């Protein structure tokens, strides 16, 4: 198929930067817009056109569409920290929902036909059954999940009214780093468990907090479905191809491995990979954390013929730790 120009919003961020690499590796023309509030310019390859700014800047976005001949959008820009969303809900509705409204409006006006959206398992809230199917009730329990669900609804309504199709990929817990260490999670004050744990391994932290040990799970800690960021990036490219090939079809797909790991099981993996234990401290539950989130990925596998390459927690942790050590070396220079 012809590979049309793609605009990646939030392409200097963690997941977006890996999507940029996957697109480039696949021969897609790609450009990036990022306001650098959470992203890092250095992870965007030097030959990729980069625009510093907000997706809410209609004039800038419109200019990018013209200059790059944009045919499709991969949309990662937004705020993503669950506890912060509870403290600052209006920030999340502005950055995630209102910002995407502006982006969709600009796309419709310019005739950009395909949008692939970075959604989340947080749209499901605290699910009644595991694994979670895409058709299960969406009852988010924090503003982050609610803001993403509102965006999905905007995309659905827009696709019914305008010549536009969309995909919403509902991520579970994304971790790891590009195996070639071209990109990884940089994060300022990260709340991601594996990122925090490998920071502790290299001495950036002296311990890892375990939030809640009284959940109704095997060991009392939260259970999550961890997916390697490069496997997720591959899923994005496959989903984009599907949207372009089938312009009358929309996609809503869970992105996970369908396997749950508890906080303690993940920390055990970190200890194995690091060959030494990381100190743990037990803390009360965090507001907005459901006990268990595990995907049914049947539709993802069947619809996109997606085959993960890194579906092993030790591999995920190894790549995350290698990236963290690279960051530590860069900081020391």
Describe each PLM feature range.
Residues 1-177:
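N-terminal Rossmann-like NAD(P)+-binding domain of SDR-like oxidoreductases, especially those catalyzing
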């Amino acid at each position: 198929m012809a590979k049309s120009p793609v605009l990646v919003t939030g392409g200097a961020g963690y997941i977006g930067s890996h999507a940029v690499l996957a697109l480039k590796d696949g021969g897609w023309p790609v450009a990036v817009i990022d306001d650098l509030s959470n992203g890092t310019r250095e992870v965007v390859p030097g030959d990729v056109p980069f625009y510093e700014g907000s997706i809410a800047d209609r004039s800038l976005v419109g200019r990018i569409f013209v200059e790059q001949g944009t045919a499709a959008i991969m949309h990662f820009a937004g705020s993503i920290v669950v506890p912060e969303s509870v403290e600052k809900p209006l920030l999340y509705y502005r950055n995630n929902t209102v910002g995407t409204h502006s982006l969709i409006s600009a796309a419709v006006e310019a005739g950009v036909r395909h949008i692939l959206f970075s959604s989340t398992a947080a749209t499901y809230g605290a699910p009644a059954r595991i694994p979670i199917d895409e058709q299960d009730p969406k009852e988010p329990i924090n503003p982050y999940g609610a803001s993403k669900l509102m965006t999905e609804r905007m995309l659905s309504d827009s696709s019914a009214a305008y010549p536009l199709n969309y995909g919403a990929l509902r991520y579970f817990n994304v971790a790891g780093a590009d195996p070639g260490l071209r990109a990884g999670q940089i994060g300022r004050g990260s709340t991601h468990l594996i990122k925090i744990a490998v920071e502790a391994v290299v001495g950036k932290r002296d311990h890892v907090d375990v939030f809640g040990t009284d959940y109704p799970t095997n060991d009392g800690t939260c259970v999550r479905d961890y997916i390697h960021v490069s496997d997720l990036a591959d899923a994005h490219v496959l989903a984009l191809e599907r949207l372009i090939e089938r312009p009358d079809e929309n996609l809503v797909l869970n992105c996970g491995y369908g396997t749950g790991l508890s906080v303690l099981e993940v920390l055990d993996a970190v200890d194995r990979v690091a060959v030494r234990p990381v100190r743990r401290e037990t803390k009360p539950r965090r507001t907005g954390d459901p006990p268990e989130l595990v995907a049914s990925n049947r539709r993802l596998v069947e619809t996109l013929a997606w085959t993960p390459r890194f579906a092993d927690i030790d591999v995920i942790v190894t790549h995350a730790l290698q990236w963290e050590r690279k960051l530590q070396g860069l900081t020391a220079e």
